[in-house]
Structure formats: C-alpha cells, structure tokens
Amino acid sequence: VLARTRKHEENEEENDMTDKERFKAIFETQVMRAGAEKLLEWLESTDFFEAPASTRFHGAYPGGLVAHSLNVYDQLLFDHSALKYGGQTLAVCALLHDVCKANYYHRDSDGWTVRDTLPMGHGEKSVYLIQKHMSLTDEEALAIRWHMGAYDEAYRGGSRALGEAQERCALVMALHQADMRATQQEKLREGL
C-alpha cells in the first residue's frame, strides 16, 4: 500500500509539471552517459519544446512535439518486450525518436509548413542529430532509425533493412508500435 501511495504521489507531482519539465526530469534521471547534458542544451537551443508534432495529422499545435515524445515514452513503458532494454534506453528512444523535427516546422498564414534544412530522411536524421552530441547503442540507433516502420521512405522504396532490423532487435518494433499507439490516441483526443 505504501508503494502504491508513493507512486500515486509521484504521478500527482508529475501531473503538475509542464511537458518540458517532465521531459527534462525523465531525461536527466534516466540518461546517464557522456554528452547527455550537451544534447539537452542543444534541444533547448532549438524549438523542440515549442514545435508541433506534425503539420495537421496529430499534435499540430505549439508543444505538440514534446507532448508526443512523452506519450511515446509512456506507451513504450507498457511494452513488456521493451523493458529488458532498461530505463535509459527506453528514455533515449522514446524521448528522442523525433528530434529530426526540431527547427523543422514553421508557422505561416496557412498554419504549419515544413522547411527541412537537412533533408536526409526521418529516422536517420534523428540518429545523426543525437550522435552529434551523445552516442547511441546499436539497438537504440536501429529503433530510432526504423521507428516509422512501413511508413519509412526507404521501406516504401523496396529496402529490406526494416525487416532485418526488426529480426535483430525487438526494440525496433516496440518503439514503432509505441509511436503508433501514441499517435492514434492523440488523433482521437484531437478529433482527427
């Protein structure tokens, strides 16, 4: 009972936080590797915490990207196949899978538009940007690279690497499914 009470109190405290505060609290307590502080500093220098998650499909509002990242984190924690990777890896993958969207969307008179200054693909761009500041394990890199699943341009172009990545690493499918569940929940909440 005491453990449940403490967990309830922690959840209440977490609910009082902004999404940015919650993201930073999770990141700072879970990610303990060289470069993590520099990565967080870089994120703060971008629009990551104010950016939308998309132009119109889900989270198309200021702060939608960080809200989506937290939703993916929450979903990934429910996936028993992912738990074996540990808290640090789950936080890295879920919280950072869409860092490619930092400084990516811009507001205009019609809403949000895309201005991609580094057009290298979605998942691979996130891996690249993270590794400019902090190293990733092979499993983390695979999961982030392929988190779009069959929606990834390389897969749609005929690449077989997605299937190989999923066979080698359960985290690839776990992150993809967490991302899809979070997106669907967001779309329902937003009436899309």
What are these regions (language model features)?
Residues 2, 6-192:
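Metal-dependent phosphohydrolase cores
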